[in-house]
């Protein structure tokens, strides 16, 4: 059984690397194999899936889609452009703003919202939009680790360590991931000042985009507020956060479909068409991929592979928590530069628990280090994260082909500075 499980696991990751489209197929097929051969008992399959994480992800996807289509992000960006005429400063602030938005909105959605602003600025000044858009993408990836709802990897970490929304700010009486990420973001400002030192033009003021529907904004703010409030409820059900995200999305969808209001210009006519458009925005493939991975990881745990990998990691680290932590962070940076960080994080979290148990330490430092390396490591290459792929795709549609060298000119220094600061801070607060 162990050989079958190991071969299936390796095959899944090879296919995820080679076949970026239809990524859900390999994990789901492997999960079915695990059940079929008896590695995971059929009667226990549903219990292996973290439904709280899937519900949070699904609900947040839907709410974010409504938020994007309300044109509120464009309005916020327009105000930003009008307030900061200097191109160099504007690009940096736009990247930082993308990071702020990405702390609460999916990274890909953030790029889709703000890339048009960067392109519009570039066209006005007759400069290449490549560097501004890449800066937006890498900044979005950085801040995705800041909060519970910022990125799928954060949701996976929260599910593993049983974290609440506020735990990303203060955990075990110490600063949480949010503050480590902010220090990393501030550390990248000098890097961006140097990268964009030649951009000295100015942008003419533009009319702010009109927002006709403020309900999605209320929904998004309400989701964050409800998650914060739920953090204070003792003994709450395990799927509370999932029900919050799904509940607010469904209520918002019903309101969008049936409440009397002015119809947006880009909106499908009729409640059924409106609901269908919104539901299309939910990435069912990612949900299926995660469900399959949950089953696979449970199977790997049952046959002892997770324990074996944990022992190898501890052995390579020589039993030293600091050396093991260092290997976890920088190996995650390297791996995430070439493979998607979602399946990588999902597979490695149980390994962190096993390695920590072998060394007799709290797994928090290894798990936080994993998130730092896996989330920020995706910024090294154009294929390291979905937001990067989205950004380069947008640029290609505009007629700009982004080479790996062009991307890495921004991605490498940005990543090294951000990871180094996070690496040091996590160890100082959770490892020493």
What are these regions (language model features)?
Residues 13-21, 97-106, 137-149, 330-344, ...:
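Transmembrane alpha-helix interface/packing and boundary motifs in multi-pass membrane proteins
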Residues 1-6, 40-43, 84, 116-133, ...:
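Hydrophobic alpha-helical transmembrane segments
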Residues 170-180, 292, 323-432:
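C-terminal transmembrane helix pair
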Residues 43-130, 285-359, 364:
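Membrane-embedded alpha-helical segments and adjacent helix-loop junctions characteristic
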Residues 74-76, 109-120, 133-134, 146-163, ...:
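Re-entrant/interfacial helical elements at transmembrane boundaries that shape
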Residues 1-67, 173-311, 410-432:
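Hydrophobic transmembrane alpha-helices of multi-pass small-molecule transporters
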């Amino acid at each position: 059984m162990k050989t079958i499980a190991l071969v299936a696991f390796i095959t899944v990751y090879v296919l995820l690397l080679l076949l970026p489209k239809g990524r859900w197929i390999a994990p789901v097929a492997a999960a079915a194999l695990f059940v079929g051969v008896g590695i995971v008992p059929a009667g226990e399959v549903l219990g292996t899936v973290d439904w709280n994480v899937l519900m949070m992800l699904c609900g947040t996807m839907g709410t974010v889609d409504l938020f994007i289509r309300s044109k509120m992000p464009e309005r916020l960006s327009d105000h930003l452009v009008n307030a900061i005429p200097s191109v160099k400063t504007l690009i940096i602030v736009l990247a930082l703003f993308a990071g702020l938005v990405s702390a609460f909105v999916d990274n890909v959605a953030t790029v889709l919202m703000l890339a048009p602003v960067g392109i519009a600025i570039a066209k006005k000044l007759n400069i290449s939009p490549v560097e501004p858009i890449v800066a937006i993408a890498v900044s979005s990836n950085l801040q995705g680790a800041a909060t519970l709802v910022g990125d799928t990897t954060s949701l996976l970490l929260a599910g593993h360590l049983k974290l609440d929304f506020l735990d990303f700010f203060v955990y075990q009486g110490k600063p949480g991931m949010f503050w480590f990420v902010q220090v990393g973001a501030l550390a990248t400002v000098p890097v961006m000042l140097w990268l964009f030192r030649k951009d000295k033009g100015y942008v003419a003021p533009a009319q702010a985009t009109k927002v006709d529907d403020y309900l999605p904004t209320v929904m998004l703010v309400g989701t964050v507020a409800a998650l914060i409030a739920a953090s204070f409820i003792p003994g709450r059900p395990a799927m509370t956060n999932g029900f919050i995200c799904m509940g607010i999305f469904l209520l918002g969808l019903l309101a969008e479909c049936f409440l009397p209001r002015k119809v947006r210009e880009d909106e499908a006519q009729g409640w059924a068409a409106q609901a269908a458009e919104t539901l299309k925005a939910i990435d069912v493939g990612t949900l299926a991929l995660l469900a399959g991975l949950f089953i696979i990881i449970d199977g790997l745990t049952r046959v002892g592979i997770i324990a074996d990998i944990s022992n190898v990691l501890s052995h390579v680290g020589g039993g030293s928590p600091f050396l093991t932590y260092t290997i976890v962070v920088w190996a995650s940076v390297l791996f995430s530069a070439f493979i998607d960080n979602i399946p990588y994080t999902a597979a490695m979290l149980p390994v962190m628990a096993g390695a920590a148990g072998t060394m007799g330490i709290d797994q928090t430092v290894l798990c936080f280090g994993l998130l730092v390396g896996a989330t920020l490591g995706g910024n090294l290459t154009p294929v390291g994260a979905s937001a990067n792929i989205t950004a380069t795709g947008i640029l290609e549609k505009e007629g700009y082909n982004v080479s790996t060298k062009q991307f890495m000119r921004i991605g490498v220094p940005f990543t090294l500075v951000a990871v180094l600061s996070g690496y040091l801070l996590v160890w100082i607060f959770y490892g020493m």
